[in-house]
Regions:
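N-terminal Sec/ER secretory leader and immediately downstream segment
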Residues: 36-113
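Generic helix N-cap/helix-start motif at coil->alpha-helix transitions
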Residues: 40-52, 80, 158-167, 196-201, ...
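Hydrophobic/aromatic side-chain positions at a characteristic register within alpha-helices
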Residues: 36, 55-58, 75, 175-178, ...
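Extended amphipathic alpha-helical interaction segments
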Residues: 116-195
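Structural register within alpha-helical repeat arrays
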Residues: 50, 90, 167-170, 186, ...
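Residues that mark the junctions of alpha-helical repeat units in TPR/alpha-solenoid scaffolds
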Residues: 36, 43, 83, 179, ...
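A cross-kingdom marker for long, charged
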Residues: 203-236
Length: 236
């Protein structure tokens, strides 16, 4: 089930979190007798979006601040399960940049997390053995169902939403299954969105491969792109 999205930034990765929080916004256009959603819901969703966008753009300070404020908003409810859900969404965004560090924020709350959240956490940790596909966001179903590497890569590249597409590519990379075409697709996705952090990371992956092949032209071209992003490009 794909949650409704009320903002320009892709939020399908937050399917579990927004299913509970953002759906409240839909009542604003309904009957006048329906009370508006509480402020904490709207604030938490907005802050999570801000944290994700800041991370993807490479602004760690803004990410940290937005996550801190988001946690404060959710803490007002006493809902540990919702906080765990939000932490998981934040970790999923980091994975798009090949950051596979433990999801400490979720792990400390996992005992109170919903079963579906725990399944998603396993998916993000690439622990797929015996994982129930139906418990996960629908856009990952085809990739997870494929045992053949080529078909799994194709399924990942066909994911329509950019952030889940990057996450799928990252998880294939983590398991050593990502094909060069999937790495190229990840670069194209991050570039098109202007997501500096994952773009740099995926370009480094491609640069490493070019080095291993001794492809001097590819190495030079990739380094020029990296230098441009880092502001180190030589003036004309």
């Amino acid at each position: 089930m794909k949650p409704q999205n009320t903002k320009h930034h892709d939020q399908t990765t937050n399917w579990l979190f927004l299913l509970v929080l953002a759906v409240g916004a839909l009542t604003l256009s309904g009957c006048s007798s329906t009370p508006p959603p509480p402020n904490w819901k709207m604030n938490a969703v907005s802050l999570l979006e801000r944290a994700q966008q800041s991370w993807l753009e490479g602004d760690s300070k803004a990410t940290k601040l937005a996550l801190h404020k988001m946690r404060q908003e959710i803490a007002q409810t006493g809902r540990i399960d919702l906080l765990a859900r939000a932490e998981l969404a934040a970790c999923a965004t980091r994975i798009a940049s090949l950051d596979f560090s433990p999801c400490v924020g979720f792990d400390t709350l996992a005992a109170d997390a919903a079963a579906s959240d725990q399944a998603y956490a396993r998916f993000l940790a690439a622990d797929w053995a015996g994982l129930e596909i139906k418990a996960l966001p629908a856009h990952y179903a085809n990739m997870l169902a494929e045992k053949d590497d080529a078909n799994a890569n194709l399924a990942a590249r066909k994911i329509k939403d950019p952030l889940p597409r990057l996450i799928a590519a990252a998880l294939l990379f983590r398991s050593g299954r990502a094909e060069p075409s999937t790495v190229a697709a990840a670069i194209e996705t991050a570039s098109e969105r202007g997501w500096r952090r994952p773009l740099l990371t995926w370009l480094e992956v491609q640069l490493k491969r070019a080095r291993s092949l001794g492809d001097q032209d590819a190495m030079a071209a990739l380094q020029r792109r990296i230098d441009l992003i880092l502001g180190q490009a030589k003036p004309p």
